[in-house]
Amino acid sequence: AARAVRRILVAGPVTGMVKFLARPKVEGIDRLSDLAKRTDVGGVIFAPNHHSHIDTPLMTTAVPSPWNDRLVVAAAADYFFDKRTKGTIAALALNAFPIDRETTSRKSSDELRALLARDWSVVIYPEGGRSPDGWGQDFKAGAAYLSIKTGSPVVPVFIDGTGSIFGKGMKRPRRGHVRVIFGAPLFPEENDNTRRFNERIEKAVTLLGDESLTDFWTSRQRAAAGRSTALTGPEYSGWRRQWSLYEHRKLGAAGQRRRQKRRWPNLG
């Protein structure tokens, strides 16, 4: 009964709210087509960057079939579950699972592993919390750890634009445009430990972020040349860091204009 109610809520109010506020454009679904056909893979770990509380309903609506019907979102316990009514709504509408932003308890980890073992998929924000300044944060190893322990693949995801809609410190949301880019699934390799696999996940999300700024081929060329923009931004702080973010967004605006101008050649 709860799943039936959740389907109605996601298809109706949740999707309506996301479309109204974010007008999302979802890309990269084709990169998951082979994974969807594999009968030896059950639960999947989706690992997006995190800029806004809007990210949680956004991911609930953006994750494609066959995973969206059995999807749990690891959500901040101190925000989504700070009040009983809010927690009930989050659990029912978003299938949100309360998790501590800073440290994942043994109990939470075991429960997530059990869900993955039962072919449920999980959304985990590796940064552990929302961006405080528009740049990303270093990834924590929760997604990598769960993947290594369960064998579940990690799908890197880059979300672009939610920080401008309802970023940290904003009192109320405002409308904007959002892109959600799914990357190719990552499996832990034989010699991977949690640290190395976590670095691969962060690198994959960084590449998707550069793809969002430019385009697929430009981002790969920049990565090969070692010129990808770091997800965490420059190491310095203060106005220089904010200025770099401004320049970073100018690059993204230029990339968007290039994509809009691109047309298929006339072969007639």
Annotate each language-model stretch with its function:
Residues 17-25, 50, 98-102, 133, ...:
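Short, flexible loop segments at the rims of nucleotide/cofactor-binding pockets, characterized by
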Residues 38-102:
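Catalytic core of membrane glycerolipid acyltransferases/transacylases, capturing the structured
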Residues 28, 58, 107-111:
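Well-ordered alpha-helical segments embedded in enzymatic catalytic cores
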Residues 15-50:
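Helix-to-loop junction immediately C-terminal to a conserved catalytic motif
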Residues 3-22, 91:
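Short hydrophobic helices that act as membrane-entry/anchoring signals
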Residues 5, 106-268:
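Non-catalytic C-terminal accessory region of glycerolipid acyltransferases
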Residues 17, 92-99, 126-129:
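Short, basic, glycine/proline-bearing loop/turn elements
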Residues 26, 73, 96-98, 154-156, ...:
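Conserved beta-strand scaffold positions in the cores of enzyme catalytic domains, especially
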